[in-house]
Amino acid sequence: MAVLSEDVLLYLKEKNIPMLFEQIVQNIISDAPERPMSYIGDLMRRGIPLQIFIAGPAGSGKRTQCKNIADRLGVVLISSGQVLTRGVESGSETSQLAHSYVSRGERVPDTLVSMIMKDRLSQSDACEKGWLVEGYPRNAQQAQAVEECGVIPQVFILLDLPEDLSFRRLEHRRYDPATNKXYHMLDNPPPGGRCRVMRTAPAEGCKFP
């Protein structure tokens, strides 16, 4: 095998060639096309959709950053909490199994959560436009489970936030059900300084991990 020169290695790095080949191989493994060469040609013509995970602690600004990035890149924004809730309500075999855990007040296993997420990421809009998943995976077990399902993002962004700052942001959150608006008593107070409901955690579903 030929030894690559420094110039060649630099070129490969600048043009993201290793990532390109990795994505081609991942798509082939996922779709198992009958004619791989024709499949690769078609994939290159239509482009490889972006696949992004953004995770972080509560109060780290995931929702705001995800919306900004999704709008800029034109990818489908997928909230993990909404996917899990709607997945349970969809009536599929997987969702019915998840519902059996929820109805007993038990934690839905990570492998089952990853299957529900994979189903959503396999839908036509996400496949065509690419996707950005907000708030998933939430732990190492979920990361391993979703990888075993064949979902490997091109980019994983972790929003780091000190625990005391996370608590400060959550402590002062308020939600007004009359206007369906969220406020922060220090940074973005409601008109008149009053708001009926205090929200101390994101609405992501306590029954899911």
Curated annotation (Swiss-Prot):
LID as annotated region, ranges: 172-205
Residues holding ATP: 59-64, 173
Reaction equations catalysed: AMP + ATP = 2 ADP
Molecular function (Gene Ontology), one example: adenylate kinase activity
Keywords: ATP-binding, Cytoplasm, Kinase, Nucleotide-binding, Transferase
Quaternary assembly: Monomer.
Protein name: Adenylate kinase
Protein source organism: Trypanosoma brucei rhodesiense
Species classification: Eukaryota, Discoba, Euglenozoa, Kinetoplastea, Metakinetoplastina
